[in-house]
């Protein structure tokens, strides 16, 4: 998917890229590849692949479920790495208030420099483990929408993300092709954490065989105070 096809595909979903937005994606690609030479951000560096597997993949929830992204909503992206999915979404929807949580300072340094080059405001970068941030009253149950892409299996991911979503908010997981198995394993975790799966959708990225599953979870009850557990525990002992 080259930049022109990317823009053309978005326009079919009523997202007409402005010249500024087109340039922001071009700069994002160039900076990603440049910094990736000395900081491990991604194994994908070919332009067509970055536009498909990073940029387009990140915005698919916004294209398919625009109603989930309310005007001015507060979005938290857990383990965003090089900014996926939240920054491509933010480029398309500058009104969103975005908080990015990541445990690696080098990645956050990249994002800080990138945001300056892109001229993007309204993004808060938080250095820390999701388990610790989820217990911090400044962030706990403060977000309308919490996103995560390819961070951990669903049972673990739920404990990272659901404590950050406010009651009535949503948790959106961007998963691979085998999400059904993960969801089965995560039933107990979701119940304990106050989440309820409302929708899953399997898609294939355009012009490829890349299968993705989007999982939308409603935060129906407050998360008990003991969750998330101590850093490292969710991964070692999933709920």
Swiss-Prot record:
Family annotation (CDD domains): AdoMet_MTases
HAMAP family listed in its UniProt record: 16SrRNA_methyltr_G
GO CC terms of this entry: cytosol
Gene: rsmG
UniProt similarity note: Belongs to the methyltransferase superfamily. RNA methyltransferase RsmG family.
SUPFAM superfamilies, alphabetized: S-adenosyl-L-methionine-dependent methyltransferases (SSF53335)
Key words, A-Z: Cytoplasm, Methyltransferase, rRNA processing, S-adenosyl-L-methionine, Transferase
Binding-site residues, S-adenosyl-L-methionine: 79, 84, 130-131, 149
EC identifiers of the protein: 2.1.1.-
Pfam family, one: GidB
Record's subcellular location: Cytoplasm
Bridged cysteine pairs (disulfide): none
Function: Specifically methylates the N7 position of a guanine in 16S rRNA.
Organism: Lactobacillus delbrueckii subsp. bulgaricus (strain ATCC 11842 / DSM 20081 / BCRC 10696 / JCM 1002 / NBRC 13953 / NCIMB 11778 / NCTC 12712 / WDCM 00102 / Lb 14)
Gene3D superfamilies reported in the protein's UniProt record: Vaccinia Virus protein VP39 (3.40.50.150)
Protein name: Ribosomal RNA small subunit methyltransferase G
InterPro entries assigned: rRNA_ssu_MeTfrase_G, SAM-dependent_MTases_sf
MF terms (GO), sorted A to Z: rRNA (guanine-N7-)-methyltransferase activity
Taxonomy of the source species: Bacteria, Bacillati, Bacillota, Bacilli, Lactobacillales
């Amino acid at each position: 998917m080259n930049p022109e096809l990317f823009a053309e595909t978005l326009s079919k979903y009523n997202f007409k890229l402005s010249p500024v937005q087109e340039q922001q994606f071009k700069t994002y690609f160039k900076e990603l590849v440049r910094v990736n030479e000395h900081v491990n951000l991604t194994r994908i560096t070919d332009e067509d692949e970055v536009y498909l597997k990073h940029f387009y993949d990140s915005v698919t929830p916004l294209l398919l479920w625009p109603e989930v992204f309310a005007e001015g909503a507060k979005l938290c992206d857990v383990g965003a790495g090089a900014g996926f999915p939240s920054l491509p979404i933010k480029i398309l929807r500058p009104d969103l208030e975005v908080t990015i949580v990541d445990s690696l300072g080098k990645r956050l340094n990249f994002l800080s420099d990138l945001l300056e080059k892109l001229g993007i405001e309204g993004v808060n970068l938080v250095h820390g483990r999701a388990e610790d941030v989820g217990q911090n009253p400044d962030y706990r149950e403060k977000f309308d929408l919490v996103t995560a892409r390819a961070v951990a299996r669903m049972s673990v991911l739920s404990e990272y993300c659901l404590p950050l979503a406010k009651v009535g908010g949503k948790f959106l997981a961007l998963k691979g092709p085998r999400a059904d198995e993960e969801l089965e394993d995560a039933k107990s975790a979701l119940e304990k954490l106050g989440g309820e799966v409302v929708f899953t959708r399997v898609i294939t990225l355009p012009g490829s065989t890349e299968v993705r599953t989007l999982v939308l979870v409603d935060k129906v009850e407050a998360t008990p105070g003991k969750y998330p557990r101590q850093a490292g525990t969710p991964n070692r002992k999933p709920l």
